[in-house]
Each structure stands twice: as C-alpha cells, then as structure tokens.
C-alpha cells in the first residue's frame, strides 16, 4: 500500500506541475484566453486516461502502483475532468445510459450551481 501511495503522490505532483505550467504559459502569452489552458489539459487528460485505461485492460499484469500512479496521480493531478469522462463512458458501455446522462447532467449543472453558490456565499 505504501508503494501505491508514493506512486500516486509523486505522479500527482508531476501532473499538477504540468497543469500549473500550462496555465502560467497561457496567461503570459494569451491573457484574454485564460480558459485555453484548462480546455487543453482537460482534452489532453481525457486522451491520456483513455489510452491508459485501454492499455491496462490489455495488460492486467501492470502493477497497481503504476496503474494508480498514472491514472489517479498523474492524470488526476492534471485534470479531474478526465476521470469524469471515463466514468461516464464506462456507464454508457455497460448499458447504463440513464445513469450516465444523469451523472453527466448533475455533474455539469450541479457543479456550475455549486460554484455559483460558493461565490455567492462570499458576498454575504
């Protein structure tokens, strides 16, 4: 378990630093397009998590430390949107379309509502 925690932590640092670097670079070069870094890391993260998930399905012998380190740590540090996308896709693939679309809708609209509520609370 300690090796898994260490792998997730180390890879998480790398993913987080990459996300920070992307945001810093975009802010310095295109300040009006601040959202571009988030969009880029979300899309790249989705591509990476899809590749890793598919690769790990084909290679069950890959140790849990590597699996968790790369998916939970690195990709999770880079973006949590990729995990959300994979969860939705897995629900669809398992024939649970109603749950998948409910999850999608609640995540997006609930997230926007929760963010608005949090911002509103700071104005009280």
UniProtKB/Swiss-Prot annotation:
Bilayer-spanning residue ranges: 5-25, 38-58, 69-89, 97-117
A Pfam family per the record: CRCB
Subcellular localization: Cell inner membrane
Regulation: Na(+) is not transported, but it plays an essential structural role and its presence is essential for fluoride channel function.
One GO CC term, this protein: plasma membrane
InterPro entries noted in UniProt: FluC
Chemical reaction(s) catalysed: fluoride(in) = fluoride(out)
Binding, Na(+): 76, 79
Topology of this chain in the membrane: Multi-pass membrane protein
GO biological process: cellular detoxification of fluoride
Keywords: Cell inner membrane, Cell membrane, Ion channel, Ion transport, Membrane, Metal-binding, Sodium, Transmembrane, Transmembrane helix, Transport
Molecular functions per Gene Ontology: fluoride channel activity; metal ion binding
Top-level lineage group: Bacteria
Function text: Fluoride-specific ion channel. Important for reducing fluoride concentration in the cell, thus reducing its toxicity.
Family: Belongs to the fluoride channel Fluc/FEX (TC 1.A.43) family.
Protein name: Fluoride-specific ion channel FluC
